[in-house]
């Protein structure tokens, strides 16, 4: 009975279907959709990807030309020994005054030599620098310079009252030793680092100073730092800035720090050297440099309109006709961020800020009348467009999007020189900065491609002035934190101890309660999966031969996405 009933229902449905005025033919609908998709692909997708290929190849060639130019300049500098002290006048401070005094009057000669030392301000901006505050303060207070001709200024924006107390006591300790050190705080953090530096220049004692040496909290200059840098400013009135090289105390801590060392060594050894030698301009690195105060005033002082106040000041100073000199022989020890979280925040600031500054100053640069046409072209094209925009965008668009997408589109052909030869030459040009890490080049390139996702998002944010454009997160420094031994009871609590007093201060528990899903970086995971799928498609269908690159690049995205890079903070 149930079967006959079921058969009757089926017959009724068939009768009603047959009476419909328009019969739905699913195969025809599918064919229509396929035809529409093919038409859209031919009319929109393929031309768009071809345009991206052309733009990517053009930008890659621009970057190659810039790297070859930098390499040629640095080769010439080394071949002809065009050191800074051969291009500019350099004499030891006080030597001329001492020589001019009577040889019979040794005391008057020493007095004259001491008087020849200019007044120097040493600024150290800080923000909750619990692990490293003693490093820069101790190094600054140990600089070889007449004690009555230098002022150490600690600009503490800390919000942690315990840290504030520690920093103030450290300043008082050095003050008790006869060092002219000033501990300065302000009521708010307006303008972040730029605001602190600007506020620091308003004190009356600064009016007596001619030059400013700047160090971040983790930087440790050698005692002869001022003796080797200030003479360039004293004997060359056209020089506004002397920038020195960073040297990293924790470069061998993990792969993340090794990769950073490779990138920054190239930046200092080649990019800064070339800019100084040819154009007398480069981007101020924000620390380990000495400024002429008159040049800062002439450029309009510190501005907090972007997160790269150091680059902002440098560009405005060079547009006023001032020159910069890079002294690579002087190295200042510093710390690299060893956690991926800290590194991401730093790279966001370093990518977003320049793009935002370029947008604000592109017209001003072209309209400037005080610098030569070629200097304006270098500033606009080489420094900003190629160095800060193209380099941050083409890496992701080309290697992480265009090449994987081309696997799915047989109509797209990328020339071999654009896939192999040009990228190889660019990589080799950059890898020479750290010969000891040459065996890590492939891993370094893969990691840089992964970071390009973060950098392109930051650059777009800067250009559009959206979202986190003015976000300032101080780069976390671990100091010796990773060497801290766990408590005897097995807990993760860490007591903050003043190593000189050897008595605990206010104990502060640091508990890691990060939810496991907060550790992952989902955009990197998504891109990694897409690239690996493209690799499988290439193996099975496309046969373009990109699959080896796609597999290892996708794996690199997944490794970073699952946070298997850097060290775990204590």
From Swiss-Prot:
GO BP terms in the entry: cell wall organization
Highest taxon of source: Eukaryota
- Give the keywords, sorted: Cell wall biogenesis/degradation, Glycosyltransferase, Golgi apparatus, Membrane, Transferase, Transmembrane, Transmembrane helix
- Name the catalysed reactions: GDP-mannose + (glucomannan)n = GDP + (glucomannan)n+1
Q: Which SUPFAM superfamilies match?
A: Nucleotide-diphospho-sugar transferases
Major localization listed first in the record, in broad terms? Golgi
| Alphabetized GO MF terms | glucomannan 4-beta-mannosyltransferase activity; mannan synthase activity
Report how it sits in the membrane: Multi-pass membrane protein
* Pfam short name (any one): Glyco_trans_2_3
Segments passing through the bilayer: 57-77, 389-409, 412-432, 522-542, 548-568
User: Could you tell me the EC number(s) of this protein?
Assistant: 2.4.1.32
Q: Name the positions where substrate binds.
A: 216, 218
Query: Where's it found, cell-wise?
Result: Golgi apparatus membrane
Question: Gene3D superfamilies of this UniProt entry?
Answer: Spore Coat Polysaccharide Biosynthesis Protein SpsA, Chain A (3.90.550.10)
Residues at the catalytic site: 157, 310
Naming one, the record's GO cellular component terms include: Golgi apparatus
- Protein family: Belongs to the glycosyltransferase 2 family. Plant cellulose synthase-like A subfamily.
Function, in words? Probable mannan synthase which consists of a 4-beta-mannosyltransferase activity on mannan using GDP-mannose. The beta-1,4-mannan product is the backbone for galactomannan synthesis by galactomannan galactosyltransferase. Galactomannan is a noncellulosic polysaccharides of plant cell wall.
- What's the protein here called? Probable glucomannan 4-beta-mannosyltransferase 11
Which organism does this record belong to?
A: Oryza sativa subsp. japonica
What taxonomic ancestry is recorded?
Eukaryota, Viridiplantae, Streptophyta, Embryophyta, Tracheophyta
Q: List the gene name.
A: CSLA11
